[in-house]
Amino acid sequence: MYGIEYTTTLTFLILLVLLNYILKSITRIMDYILYHFLLFIVIVTPFVNSQNYGINLPITGSMDTNYQNVSNPEPFLTSTLCLYYPVEAETEIADSSWKDTLSQLFLTKGWPTGSVYLKSYTDIATFSINPQLYCDYNIVLMKYNANSELDMSELADLILNEWLCNPMDIALYYYQQTDEANKWISMGDSCTIKVCPLNTQTLGIGCLTTDTTTFEEVATAEKLVITDVVDGVNYKINVTTTTCTIRNCKKLGPRENVAVIQVGGSNILDITADPTTAPQTERMMRINWKKWWQVFYTVVDYVNQIIQTMSKRSRSLDSASFYYRI
């Protein structure tokens, strides 16, 4: 009987020792795996660029987010610059490698190869239909033309400011502008805008709401129109909707990642005459040179000084999104 008890006790002790050994072995294996995993994470982390995700926060006001101005002479290694110019510049220069030359010149000012994009446009009117300013910093060169001075002024007002816009259903509703910052912006191949002011009985003032030929014409066959009417008055609006779209917009403030350089002309455009526009002449400047090579040399030479008057933004102007919210 005692032999059986001794055997049982011995068996129990052996199992206990064996279990203890197994647990220690498992612990050592887990420690080995964990330590090596942590070592792998430490080694790999510096080479991985990942996005941190958090809760969704409500967006209010403008979707543009400004960053602190770059105020030191170090190279702009993480920024992009778009330079927009009329296509006539390419015709005059007539050099297939001129962009490579400019790229090398920008490199001397701290802009790495590949960070500067040169984009041409046909003319101011065409550029007004679909302005797309995608880079961190955007500089638009406008050659002065007395016949398109008003088009240049409206385009400058559009791209140098942030706008919050909503669609307008002019077939069903009357509209009024609530304050000086409230404008109607139209874009398209051909925009003819007519308005009929209404009295408190919704009868036309000097016009018939049922006859568009009696409406007051404020724009004729233009590609970009920023319409300003008397505040607090309802209007019946007529627009060539087949070739033009119209939006009810609110000017939010300056779009500080855009600068406009006027090339030539005896007068410099001054959009600050608009009471809704804060002084921003630093981002509206003029270069008086006849040859485009001289213009580009000047831009390269002063690019960093121009950038100092601007602020980097996370979002830039795209006319498709502009119509709804910027």
Swiss-Prot record:
Annotated compartments: Virion; Host endoplasmic reticulum lumen
Maturation and modification: N-glycosylated. The N-terminus is blocked possibly by pyroglutamic acid.
Gene Ontology CC: host cell endoplasmic reticulum lumen; T=13 icosahedral viral capsid; viral outer capsid
Location (main, coarse): virion
Positions annotated to bind Ca(2+) 2: Q177, D228, V229, D231, D301
Disulfide bond entries: C82-C135, C165-C249, C191-C244, C196-C207
Location of the region described as GPR motif in the Swiss-Prot/TrEMBL record: 253-255
Annotated segments matching region CNP motif: 165-167
Keyword match Calcium: yes
Transmembrane segments: none
Binding residues for Ca(2+) 1: D95, G206, T214, E216
This protein's UniProt keywords: Calcium, Capsid protein, Disulfide bond, Glycoprotein, Host endoplasmic reticulum, Host-virus interaction, Metal-binding, Outer capsid protein, Signal, T=13 icosahedral capsid protein, Virion
Family: Belongs to the rotavirus VP7 family.
Name by which UniProt lists this protein: Outer capsid glycoprotein VP7
Native organism: Rotavirus A (strain RVA/Human/Indonesia/69M/1980/G8P4[10])
